[in-house]
Amino acid sequence: MGKKKNSKAYSEELTDTTRPLLEFRYGNPLFAIACHPEQSVIVSGLATGHMFCHKYNAAELKEAQLKRLRKHDAGSKDDRKKLWEVVEVPGVETSGVSLLWTTKRHKGSVRCICFDADGTHIYSVGTDNVLKKADTLTGKVVKKCVLDPGQNVKYTKLVKSATHPLVLLGDENGNVTVLNSESLEQTNLIKSIHNGDAINDIFHFAKKSVYRYISLGQTTLAHWDSRESNEGDFAIAADDKQAKRKVILSDDQEDEILCGTFVDPEDGEVLVCGMGEGVLTVWRPKKNGLADQLTRIKVKKNESIDCIVPTLEDDGCVWCGCSDGNIYKVHVNRGTIIEVRKHSKLDEVTFLDLDSEYRLLSGGLDKAKLWDSEKSEQLTPGSDADDRVSNSSPSAGKSSESDSNDSENDATSSGGSSDEDSSSDESEHSDASDVEEELVGLTREQIIAELDKDLVEESEDVEDVRSQRKRKHGADLPTNANGKKQKGKNIKPERSMKTHGIRRFEGL
């Protein structure tokens, strides 16, 4: 039996070399953030009630990063220097990032924001219990309503249906308010879903019905129809297991369920939930109707998984934002962590989202980072990629690019530029996760050269075997763009057969 690997060392081995493309630093606590589903736009809401809408050019940001890399000393061992764009909020514009508008949208703090399916409108709700619908590109409010006048209700989750004109609001009392997204009029109220505890998350259960949703709260998972009230459920005895209820609750998980998502929202086969004890629980609706979890995946002991999003790359993985400041990429079927990114050493990861090109956006109370889809070593100009090795497992990534009360016309645009050198703030050097290690010993090319040297002596035998195989099968050996690597894979079995098998003496 092999020696048990130290968990800390193992985590360091998985640390990814991907750098952020962009970082936002906020002067006030960040309470909500979301990416536009079709454009390279990010909207953030702060504790002061202000909202900021930024547009970014990913290609320009990447080019600026390459320029900084060229200036960076190739021989320097300090690869932790920030080489990405840093934008102060509020502050002036920088290269590749422009401020479309900013406004004080709510009295008190902004609690939740979300886009509609095509990103035309953005919805926001604040501690003033006012829901506002605004044009995304101008910031102008087109509709608003006051929720529960006179009630001291705090909203925790805001969701817009991707297919129907529905807006759902979850609050701290465990209620879900359903409104028409066009008129902002209430159409349904589902009360006290999780025994009166706060709604931690809401997401679509599309495989079951376009009107069905899943909510998470305290230690239970529930699913329900957004069109139907659950008033009749309170007349059913708690111990009556046969009665049909409008809200179907899972078993008590004995650990707080903080967030959840489907690994593939289109097929709806596997659901994962982030727990307060640092594990992912795996649920399969077809197995037991979401009555209980089936398996658990350990992510980080004594920490909590506060947010989660699917990668949407058909790789069976999800991104998990953890209270230790790390982002973990978890392969659900394997039950393993395959990548780790460091968001911050001091702050929790409380927000995760994907931009229009599936780049990851992570956020905490003081900053947000938009991560590049390429590894750092792929971006390094003039460096020998064969002499460097990434500590992370490979991941499949997409390399393409993402009123002041009632007079909401005060949404203003601002211009200006900032010094790029500000992005190298030394106090934040330790936050970056792009440190690479030198490979000790022979490089990959040197190893290949040594293998080729050994193969020269037996090249004739190899060719004979190849010709025999061609005659036998009538086809060439498979090749790909990386000819050297494929060649090594094809020759090695032949060498082992001739060295250790009887086939070597077939001609005698």
Swiss-Prot record:
Subcellular location: Nucleus, Nucleolus
One term under GO cellular component: nucleolus
Keyword Nucleus applies: yes
Region described as Disordered: 372-508
Chain segments annotated as transmembrane: none
InterPro entries hit by this protein: WD40/YVTN_repeat-like_dom_sf, WD40_repeat_dom_sf, WD40_rpt, WDR55
Basic and acidic residues: compositionally biased ranges: 491-508
Signal peptide coordinates: none
GO BP annotations, alphabetical order: positive regulation of transcription by RNA polymerase I; ribosomal large subunit biogenesis; rRNA processing
Domain of life the protein comes from: Eukaryota
Principal location class: nucleus
Each WD repeat, start to end: 46-94, 105-144, 150-189, 194-234, 252-293, 344-381
Keywords linked to the UniProt accession: Nucleus, Repeat, WD repeat
Family: Belongs to the WD repeat WDR55 family.
Protein name according to UniProt: WD repeat-containing protein JIP5
Gene that specifies this protein: JIP5
